[in-house]
């Protein structure tokens, strides 16, 4: 039996149909249900399920807890990513140097990244304890009567969460930057050295411009991962003190599974998803997002050339 050319055109679609159906069921269907739920007041415990239209969206802007979560999420993402870039590039440069034990160091440096965030959060909760934590125990070796509750005070609790997030994911960021450094030919540095360039000049004129695309591209997924951080906060501070370390992902989970306020949680999820989508679209927009930032390295190199 022969198959006509017209029938052959449908074979690829038939083959990918199961994937499309599975993808639609696991992605599209939950999104549509979440959109629908965001228009309802759904409280599981009281059995309430009433259509309220956009009331949930209006209430978001009046909710002090949500505003606190949004403000800390912004602080968390910005501060964490700034240090990811600065310290990540610095660590990558160190790992790119030639020294004995380099391969071993490149391996063990990934141990924090390989550990579950919940384990890190629980260890940090113990480590920052005032009475028996490692942090205060170390400080008391120099200041005998030192007493400080790191996770009870807002500023230090937020700083501790950011520090542990860096401790976990910074090595992975550095290894990915290192992969970009590996593609830079050593002949370029040799030529620069012959021309009289020192280490600082080589970094700004050669290294930084050549790894800029790699670094900026890495910032996209790492920023998205910061925006969806939940497990670290859950294990380390449970959003405390008060709501001061409650990231938006933690707030959504709390509303859905602790308060059982499904409609309000769906509203927060829709708004968070919209912000993520807008950020992604802006990041890939020509001349405004990542494409524009790709020229930053060239600009830095040019400015450094002028200054010298």
Regions found by a protein language model. Give the residues of each.
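Short linear motifs in low-complexity or flexible loops
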Residues: 283-288, 292, 301, 307
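A structural signal for multi-pass alpha-helical bundles of membrane permease subunits
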Residues: 3-282, 308
